[in-house]
Amino acid sequence: IGESRDDRIESLETIAALHREYGHIQEVIIQNFAPKPGTAMENFPEPAVEEMMDSVELAARILPGDVAVQVAPNLIDPKSLIAKGVTDLGGISPLTIDWINPEAEWPDVKDLQKKLGDIPLKERLPVYPPYVKKGWYSERIGNLIKRLSDNSGYRKQPGTENAEDSEK
């Protein structure tokens, strides 16, 4: 919100350095500003699409490869951003609104897949697959994660959550 390109570069470089030291950053969300009525910034302009594209490119170039670059698929065409380095489309809910941007409906998963063409969608848990595989989660949710994740750390196909997974 009002950062310059240099500010974004500095922030991304700081995040990258922290991740290289600690290995704990799952994702960086690049989200365009959308002014909201009744707020102090209601009359501020949204950033140009080109600025979002540039921010995604910067993130993809600066961040380590194991840090996901995420955008919300309901705010801007995700296919064009995937071409610039987006690796994650975040959460899409058929049950709830986008609480941050309630004016922007979540896309229907089937419609989104059609838009993306040969780019596959793959459901994951809130804990990213590498962290699932490393066991980087609380013991309190361990059984749930083991029940819901496959051998790759992604979400099991719906309906198979209770199936035995011999490799776990």
Residue ranges and their predicted role:
Residues 2-4:
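Short, glycine-rich nucleotide/cofactor-binding loops
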